[in-house]
C-alpha cells in the first residue's frame, strides 16, 4: 500500500488526526475567549472524562532521565527475547502493542476501551535502546503519535485506530525500522 506523505514526510492520516485535534482545541480556545462565562480550566475533565489539555512538564524531551532506572544503559531489563536485556522504551512499546491489540478487539466488540494515552505518553521520557535517538526528531514524532492516541481515546473507531498504527509506522520509518513488518500486523484487518 502506497502511503501519501505530507508535512515533513508524515503519513496523511497522522496529519489529518493532528489537524483535527488542533482545530478542536483552537475552537475551544476561541469560544472560551468570547464567552461571558467564567474561563474553563483546560486541565479539568470534560463531560466524557477526557482532559481538555495536558501538562507534559513531567515527561518531555527536557526531562532528565534517571541513569539508575531499570532499562537505562547499563541497567537493561532482563528479557527472554533479548539476551542483552531491553531498554525501558522497548519494554514500554511491547506493552503499548498489547494494549493496542486489546483495544482493537474491544472496539470490534462494541466494548469500552482502556485509555491508552496515560501509558503511551511516557514514551517521551523513557530510556531508548540508543540514548542518542532521544532527540528533537524523535520527540516530534512521539508528539504526533500521541495526538493520534488521544484522538483514538476520545473517539475509538476503525479510522482512529488505523491512525495510531500509521503513527507507529511513521516513527519506525526513522528509528528501529526492523519492526515495521510486525507493526503492519496490527492493522484493523
Segment roles from a protein language model:
Residues 164-176:
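The canonical Cys-X-X-Cys-His
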Residues 27-28, 143:
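Short linear sequence elements within intrinsically disordered, low-complexity coil regions
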Residues 38-166, 180-189:
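Extracytoplasmic c-type cytochrome modules immediately beyond a signal peptide or single-pass transmembrane anchor
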Residues 2-5, 46, 168:
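A composition/secondary-structure signal for short, hydrophobic, low-basic-content segments
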Residues 3-26:
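Bacterial N-terminal signal peptides that target proteins for export
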